[in-house]
């Protein structure tokens, strides 16, 4: 269990044991501006709004997007069904294809999304096999060498700056630590060795045979901060953090993946500025924040791979 100090942000997770599959909800009752960066060949995304009251991450591939509808309905119920334009509760969702790791057709539905929201509490995140990470896996060059992952999170506070990273890694690639060691995925049980998929691909090309890779892979994530950024800065922040995840997941953003990152700001604090801290639309502050957030996200990826 990760404990974090981020007022106004609650997280809940729920799952169906008979799946197993689940959903994870990041609830920000006041709402927060959001940038979405989606890449890869098979993105599963709904909403994609630039302002959200909740982000729903779920298993179940496209069917699991129903969980987000459950979150939306529950928020409407909490508003006693008021539908004024200014009161609309916006929910964006992203899903992973987790059917590879299980033999059932169970998927996160409206009831499960609603349950994840009901379980949302401030300051706590269930790590590992919980929520959307129930049947996540990594290193799917050959299914016999695939390993189960989970969901991971990391938090960092620097003065008034708060950064929370949440991730459900379900990639074709492997999880790699800062020493360059493969720590999850593509595991040979006979030798006890995990190896980088590039070696499998090189061997296939050398033998003039098509490389083997399992279909149905996705990594979904969210990076939440309280630092105010312009729309341009927030979009670049999302791209910077998402791109940095290539270090911890290799390969990443492939045609066999469908990766989505939500960058969320609660717009509560401003970083100090000087005449030299920006160049037109370019911001040194946002770049520095993105660099720090990228490390927090790598920590979250490693937590998910434990």
UniProtKB/Swiss-Prot annotation:
The lineage of its organism: Bacteria, Bacillati, Actinomycetota, Actinomycetes, Micrococcales. It comes from the Bacteria. Gene3D superfamilies: L-amino peptidase D-ALA esterase/amidase. This gene may not be expressed. The 25 amino acid residues corresponding to the N-terminal region of NylC are replaced with 76 residues derived from non-coding regions. No potent initiation codons are found within the replaced region of nylC'. This is Putative NylC-analogous protein. One of its GO terms (molecular function) is aminopeptidase activity. Belongs to the peptidase S58 family. SUPFAM superfamilies: DmpA/ArgJ-like (SSF56266). It holds the Pfam family Peptidase_S58.
